[in-house]
Amino acid sequence: MSTTTGQVIRCKAAVAWEAGKPLVMEEVDVAPPQKMEVRLKILYTSLCHTDVYFWEAKGQNPVFPRILGHEAAGIVESVGEGVTELAPGDHVLPVFTGECKDCAHCKSEESNMCSLLRINTDRGVMINDGQSRFSINGKPIYHFVGTSTFSEYTVVHVGCVAKINPLAPLDKVCVLSCGISTGLGATLNVAKPTKGSSVAIFGLGAVGLAAAEGARIAGASRIIGVDLNASRFEQAKKFGVTEFVNPKDYSKPVQEVIAEMTDGGVDRSVECTGHIDAMISAFECVHDGWGVAVLVGVPHKEAVFKTHPMNFLNERTLKGTFFGNYKPRSDIPSVVEKYMNKELELEKFITHTLPFAEINKAFDLMLKGEGLRCIITMED
């Protein structure tokens, strides 16, 4: 048994004290895990755009002071009452959404949207008792999406922890706990392109490139990348993208351009930007009779999707997805195995590595649009 089991652990954490201000490295107290919770030692975390979005807090409920971070990998330090599936020393990925295994969603093979542990960006406390497990001088520091991985130790509900192969390199597979799995699963689990098919990917950021990687793994023969930034195409080739379309280069709607390129439309499309015009284009560019469009990007809350009903009546299908339709505990371990079996390449997503003390540099890189994923090493 760990000497820290049942004890408060004092450790370093990068605290967001207020919106848009640099994170501050603080000494925080991390309470022991309560019923159905685990305390994790975080070894590697990466920065996702969602962290930046809620750090800026321009359009959402500001919850501060807070410990952000949700893409990470670590080791179980201790477990709370009732936890039987995990033990100290297990290698794990904390996930921003969960799988209680008891609700109707968890019991359905068609859903990964757990009723109990579905992502909640406003909640800054644990669901067990409505309290935070983090504090500084007795004052609570709030959690973020149930994970808060910008801390050397964190407490997470057991349903939000995926136990993985202990041989998997944590500094690589940490990126699978959010964006990469979201894009990959959108293609493999929802769009389901067949070998030799054509796929259009809208948005060539990390999630879009993960969707392209899924199309490459599925054996698509044409992978058309759509982005307003022409400089992204060279990098996209590494992920299987064969052609590039910049909507700014054409006077006609991009869906018409793609339809002309592909003799009536692509077999599948995956939209990863969240811009409503791109969503409409992604749907209208798929072939009638069998085309499937999948929406991944999160739109503005006032956005309205408009298309003519004949696009549906002509047998086009529109689908949405959340976290690539992966159930965190049941499915993410198998995604790690795809990497271990060399089916999935993760190294090309990782463009920067920084020590924990320089975490604010990772925010700067993302705000400048430089790189894809920056791995933050927690131990010096």
UniProtKB/Swiss-Prot annotation:
Pfam families for this protein: ADH_N (PF08240), ADH_zinc_N (PF00107)
Superkingdom of origin organism: Eukaryota
GO molecular function, one term: zinc ion binding
Cystine pairings recorded for this chain: none
InterPro entries (UniProt xref): ADH-like_C, ADH-like_N, ADH_Zn_CS, GroES-like_sf, NAD(P)-bd_dom_sf
PROSITE patterns: ADH_ZINC (PS00059)
Record EC number: 1.1.1.1
Name of the gene: ADH2
Known partners and oligomeric status: Homodimer. Homotetramer.
Record's protein name: Alcohol dehydrogenase 2
Residues that, per the record, bind NAD(+): 50, 203-208, 227, 232, 273, 296-298, 323, 373
Database matches in Gene3D superfamilies: Medium-chain alcohol dehydrogenases, catalytic domain, NAD(P)-binding Rossmann-like Domain
